[in-house]
């Protein structure tokens, strides 16, 4: 299953009658809790191994595919409690054959980790782009003068809005908690700047 996370979960019911007991069903979505809950609800736990290749770009669609995209990238697997160990081993071997690096995680742990290292950076990038758009000078000097650093940190802001809307909704509880802690860190940085705290500012960078 390789679609925005809402659609991946919705397709499960359509696939249930089409797969046999030997089948391995997987996905490549960035949120795991929601699809695992649907797998459990449908009684498909003996077939499902969640998957998430930690690779990609801001571009979406098969026309932007790359043959070597996941080489040397971590590939997270989130097997259900009831899937056979033989299936997990077989899928790990398949991932390894693609020259990716399989890592097994609990699906709840996956969503906390990706919420911090993937979902939060996308939110930061998008809000920064929107902030510059909303506060730019009348003649657009901010946009015109934005150089390498700004472009590096905001490149991912051009990712699929449908995909990221659904990720934020499906992993919302974790993302909200993580954002709260990040806002605290930004507040501390502001306080250090206001206080002209040279030592703290040096340590931050």
Regions from the language model: what does each represent?
Residues 2-4, 29, 79:
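Glycine-rich, N-terminal phosphate-binding loop of Rossmann-like dinucleotide-binding domains
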Residues 139-205:
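Interdomain hinge/lid region at the active-site interface
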Residues 11-63:
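Rossmann-like NAD(P)(H) cofactor-binding subdomain of soluble oxidoreductases
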């Amino acid at each position: 299953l390789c679609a925005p996370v809402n659609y991946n979960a919705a397709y499960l019911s359509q696939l249930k009658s089409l797969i046999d007991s030997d089948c391995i069903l997987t996905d490549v979505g960035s949120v795991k809790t929601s699809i695992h809950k649907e797998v459990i609800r449908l009684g498909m736990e003996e077939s499902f191994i969640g998957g998430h290749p930690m690779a990609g770009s801001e571009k979406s669609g098969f026309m932007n595919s790359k043959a070597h995209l996941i080489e040397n990238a971590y590939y997270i697997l989130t097997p259900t409690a009831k899937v056979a160990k033989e299936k997990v081993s077989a899928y790990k071997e398949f991932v390894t054959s693609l020259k990716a690096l399989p890592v097994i995680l609990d699906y709840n742990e996956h969503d906390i980790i990706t919420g911090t290292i993937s979902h939060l950076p996308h939110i930061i990038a998008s809000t920064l782009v929107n902030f510059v758009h909303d506060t730019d000078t009348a003649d657009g000097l901010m946009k015109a003068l934005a150089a390498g650093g700004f472009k590096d940190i905001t490149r991912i802001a051009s990712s699929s809005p449908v995909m990221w809307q659904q990720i934020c909704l499906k992993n919302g509880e974790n993302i909200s908690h993580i954002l709260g802690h990040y806002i605290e860190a930004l507040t501390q940085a502001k306080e250090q700047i206001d206080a002209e705290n040279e030592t703290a500012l040096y340590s931050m960078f």
